[in-house]
Swiss-Prot record:
The gene is ligA. It comes from Corynebacterium glutamicum (strain ATCC 13032 / DSM 20300 / JCM 1318 / BCRC 11384 / CCUG 27702 / LMG 3730 / NBRC 12168 / NCIMB 10025 / NRRL B-2784 / 534). Its EC number is 6.5.1.2. Its cofactor is Mg(2+); Mn(2+). This is DNA ligase. It catalyses: NAD(+) + (deoxyribonucleotide)n-3'-hydroxyl + 5'-phospho-(deoxyribonucleotide)m = (deoxyribonucleotide)n+m + AMP + beta-nicotinamide D-nucleotide.
Amino acid sequence: MTEDNAQLRRTWNDLAEKVRYHRDRYYNEQPEIPDADFDALFKQLQQLEEDHPELAVPDSPTMVVGAPVAEQSSFDNVEHLERMLSLDNVFDEQELRDWLGRTPAKQYLTELKIDGLSIDLVYRNGQLERAATRGDGRVGEDITANARVIEDIPHQLQGTDEYPVPAVLEIRGEVFITVEDFPEVNAQRIADGGKPFANPRNAAAGSLRQKNIEDVKKRRLRMISHGIGFTEGFSPASQHDAYLALAAWGLPTSPYTEAVTDPEDVVKKVSYWADHRHDALHEMDGLVIKVDDIASQRALGSTSRAPRWAIAYKYPPEEVTTKLLDIQVGVGRTGRVTPFAVMEPVLVAGSTVSMATLHNQSEVKRKGVLIGDTVVIRKAGEVIPEVLGPVVELRDGTEREYIFPTLCPECGTRLAPAKADDVDWRCPNMQSCPGQLSTRLTYLAGRGAFDIEALGEKGAEDLIRTGILLDESGLFDLTEDDLLSSNVYTTNAGKVNASGKKLLDNLQKSKQTDLWRVLVALSIRHVGPTAARALAGRYHSIQALIDAPLEELSETDGVGTIIAQSFKDWFEVDWHKAIVDKWAAAGVTMEEEVGEVAEQTLEGLTIVVTGGLEGFTRDSVKEAIISRGGKASGSVSKKTDYVVIGENAGSKATKAEELGLRILDEAGFVRLLNTGSADE
C-alpha cells in the first residue's frame, strides 16, 4: 500500500469512526452534535467513497441503517418483518433536480419529514401485536406497552367494504410531540423534578423509551404513518392508495401529503415549505419526495440502506456548532442589559450569523458556557439566534469564565436588578444613557408605533451620539439646521441629504396617528400594541388615562394590574411627562375623537386569519376583530374559535381542519363581524 493510499485509509477510518459514534449517540438519545453536523460528516464520508471506491466496505456507515440497540437498553430486542430502511438526502436544488432526472415518475408524493422517532407497528388480523424502534433496520427495541398508550395508535384496525383489514400489516411511522404541546410537556417535567428537554424530538425519543407507563402518558405523544413494510393480504397500487387504506383503518396519516405530477412543482413545494416550516403542527427538517406508483418503486429497488424511489430534501440546519469568541452586553430601551455571544460566523437556517442571545447572566451560568467553547446555536425562522449550550467534550482547557459587568457599558452607571428576585440587570440611567435612548428612538420609529421609515438604527444612534437629540422629547421639533450636525443625514458637502429630508417629512406625517401607536412609542414597560389598543379604545386621550384610577385601568380587558401599575409609575416621572408635553406642543396626537363604538359581535372569540382577503389589509382585518371585542391570533390551537381562509392560505388551514375548528371564507367572516354569527 502506498503512502497516499495509507493516508486515504486513515482518513476514511477517522471519518467512519466519527459517523458510527455520533450515529449511535443520536439513535440512543444522547446526541452530542446537531443533525447538520452529522449530515456533513456523513456526506464527507460518502464523497470520499465515491471518489475512492476501493475504500468502501460492506459494513461502512454509509451502507447501514440506524444504529444497533444499545447494550444497556432495558427493552427486549425484536426483529422487523421487513427491513426498515433510511432515506438518502439532498441539500440543494441542483441535487434535487438531479435525483428527479434519474427518477422519472408519472406522479410523486411530497410529505413533511417529521423530526421525531421512527416506529414500526405490526398488526395481525387488525390487532396490534407489537411496536418497535428502528434500531439497525433489522432489530429494534420492543416498545409495545408504551405504544399502546399513544392515542393515535389504534389497538384494533377497523375494516371497511372497500378496505378489508389484511391478515398481516407492518406500518412505519413517526412518533413526535407537537410544537404546541412541547412547552407544557417541559413544564410538567420540571414540576416532576426533571430537567427540561432540549427540543420536541429529544422529548419524543426519551418518552417512548420510558419504562414507567404513567410517565409515557404524560408526554402527549403523537404518531403519523408514512409507509408500509411487510403485508399479507394487502397490495396497494400506489403509495397514495396505501394512505387512503391506512386512514380508513384508523391509522393517522399526514395532512400535509400532496400528489405532484410535474417535477417543477416538486421544486416549488420544497421552496414553499422552506418558508412555512414553522406552520406545521410538528417540527420538520425536510421534505420527503416519493415515487407514488408501487410497481415503479419495486423496479427502482433500494441500496443497502435506502430506497432509490424516495429522497429527503434537508433544509438548512437550525442547530449548528461554532466557536464562542466573546460574550458582550447590549443595553435595551428599558435599560435591560442583555449578554450576547460573539461567534465565528456560521450558516444556520439559511443565513450567516455571528451573534446570538444569551438572555441574562443567570442563563449564562445555567448553560455553563465559557468564552472559547464550541457551542450549539439554534435559529428558528425569524427568531433571534440563541446559544443552547457548550459541547463540553471539545474543551481543551483554554476556555475562560465570563464575568458579568457591574457598570453600564454605554454610560458607566452602576447596574442593578429592578427588584430583588429579578434575573435581568438594568441600567437605571433611563434619561440619558445613550444605549437606551438610541434603542428607544429605533423602537418608536417602528411599524408598530410612529412608522418613521427614514429613522433606522444607524440614524437613531447618530442623532443621540452627535447630541442633536438629548432624548426623544425633541424628535418632532427637528429642523434642517439641526440635521447639519448629523453624519447620517448630510452629504459630503455638509448639506442635508435625501434621507434627512425624508426624515423631516416622515416626522410631520407621523404626528397625526392613532393614539394607541403614541402609547406604544412611549416605551412604557409591559405596554405593547395589545394593551395600548385596549387603553386607547377605552379612554381616547392621554389625559383621561393619566386621570384614571389604578383599579379602573387594571380592569381594562387585556391590561391587568402589572401593566396598569407600570403605566401609572411611568407618568410619575417628571421627564417622562416632559416628553408627552413636548410631543403635544409639536402637534402629536394626544386624543382622538370618540367615534361610534362597533357592536361587540366578537366578544370572547379568538380568530385566526390566514391568506389574503379582498376587502381587508393585514392591519385592517386585525383592527376589525379587535374593535369588535375579539382576539386576533397568529396561531391555530384548540382554543381558536374561527379560522378565516383567504387566498394562498398556508398550513394553518390544514391544522384547523385537523383540529375540527370552524372554518370561514371571507363572506362568512363579514357576516360574523356584522352579526356575531357566521351562519347564512
